[in-house]
Amino acid sequence: TVLIEKLRELRVDIDFQYVQRHFLGYSFKSVREKVFDNFHVNLPKSFEAEYRTVLLEQFRCELQPTDGVQALLSGLQLQFCLATSSSPERTAEALRISGLEDFFTAKIFTAEDVSQGKPAPDLFLYAATKMGVAPSECLVIEDSHAGVTAAISAGMQVAHYTGGRHLAGTVSKVIDAFPHVPVIPHWKDLVELLPAAE
């Protein structure tokens, strides 16, 4: 809703469903380009910083870890990392607020690490290289159409996580586009998909 409100100040009138379908999983750079391409509005230089300030304030009031993720990460017996379209600052704050930062020390890769973000495979390939793992041996857990596309393009296995509150209105789009991709409504479902997660 923060992005919707900030864009409305510039007379870009979109709703929650539009954001979910067109911006979820994309870097801010990509969002900026999409706004220009679709609405012919060039976001001012100050827009990103102002948006992130308000967003982080909202995070501090509302952000919570999804049910079961801490238990899963605590018991995971294999290498894992975080590869996200968010900025380093937003990622660090989100992990701190949700109590997950200790799980990802030195294992965080963001959109700023690559020239092309999702749906290009660059971020996932970069993360795999840094982790010393072949793409074919990686399992990506993604919640967005752009992310699932990127994982498939990277030659990685992928599962579609649908348990986040922010995903309303987007699940069917991903399932329809990728009917062969396993769906994970809850983190406990990952254990059934990946025995090594126990």
Predicted regions span which residues?
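Active-site neighborhood of HAD-like aspartate-dependent phosphohydrolases
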Residues: T1-R21, N38, S153-A154
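Short, surface-exposed acidic
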Residues: V12-R21, H40-E50, D102-T105, P135
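Metal-dependent phosphoesterase signature
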Residues: D13, E33-A71
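Short, acidic loop-to-helix structural element flanking the phosphoryl-transfer center
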Residues: E57-L82, P88-A92
